[in-house]
Amino acid sequence: MDKSDFVELQSKTINFLRFPMAIAVVFIHTHADVGNLVDADFKFFSWQGIYNVVGVLFSHVLSHIAVPLFFFISGLLFFINFREWSWLRYRKKIKSRIYTLIIPYILWNLIPFLLFLLGYMVIGVKNHSLEEIKNFLYSTNINLFYDYHSWETVTNWFGKKVVMSGPFNFPLWFLRDLIFVSVLTPLIYYLINKLKVIFIILLLFAYLSNVWISIPGLSVLACFFYSLGAYISINLINVFAILKKYRKIVLTTSLILLFVSVVYDGMNTIIGSFFYPFFIIFMSSCVFYFAFLFVDKSHLMVGNTLISSCFFIYVFHCMPLPLFGNLNHLIRVFLLKIMPGQSPVDMVIVYFANPLFTVAICVFLFRILTMFLPRVSGAFMGNR
């Protein structure tokens, strides 16, 4: 396969992965009342056991490869045809990201906040004085776009819980971190150029150990996978040739780590936190390789409408809505009300129906917006 064919196939593979990864992100935020199998007080071969395994597998383990892959692909694409540093090319790329990343990031945090504030003032005015509302606005300020929410994630090698943060529309922490690493590409390029693979090894150790600086916007996840993609792109590495050579090792290790991660509930236990980053690296590699093979052999592609709707699915599925919470939560509440019971079988059905209905509604709303409000949707979607 010559270089032009490889680049084209790589581009098709990336486009093929976008929609499944968007669905995976919705699964991450789909509620699953589950726990690790070691401490389980139910029979494994029961509907409760099946529901637990399904919930852990899809919401706590498999779906978590989506965000690292998005960062990896972003680094890969930023440095395509970027063999030597060019400030002119950098400014051009950053300028385009003002429209594709920064403006949508601001809008998708500001609009839900204003809606939330409106509901807070109209409905809560009887319970809250104007002074309380004023203090609420004052305390929010820049946190709205930076670190409005915070939550604990993995346990690092020193036994300390790693704290993540996100803006008002909390899934957009990915977009925030992507903006940061995109701006820092001159530094990333310099370190790759000077330290070579040592730079990637250092970031790999930081990612595996989760020993890292605590600065919102500079997560080790973003820095490692974005830089890895950049390194591969800058050095013209044929990642598929490498994965093909070691495919048996990658696949076998991925399956072993998948089993361990499901047993120990992903990153939600101390043991799970140790294996979790290893699983992410191997399973992401595995998915990327087999997606490449599938596209190459079948020539099947995801429809343009579904690919174009990925960004809308990502920003809207958990967007805070006054009174309702968010779309994903609203659909879950609705499904639980119409189901005949609350048995584990019902819960499995609701669990899968929830994200699928959420995605379907998001795609429908996206089509309506692009058809009737193309300029508005263009601004909100970064002209995607």
Where are these predicted regions, by residue range?
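Membrane-interface starts of transmembrane alpha-helices
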Residues: 17-20, 191-202, 213, 217, ...
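Structural signal for the C-terminal ends of transmembrane alpha-helices
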Residues: 78-86, 186-194, 228-240, 263-264, ...
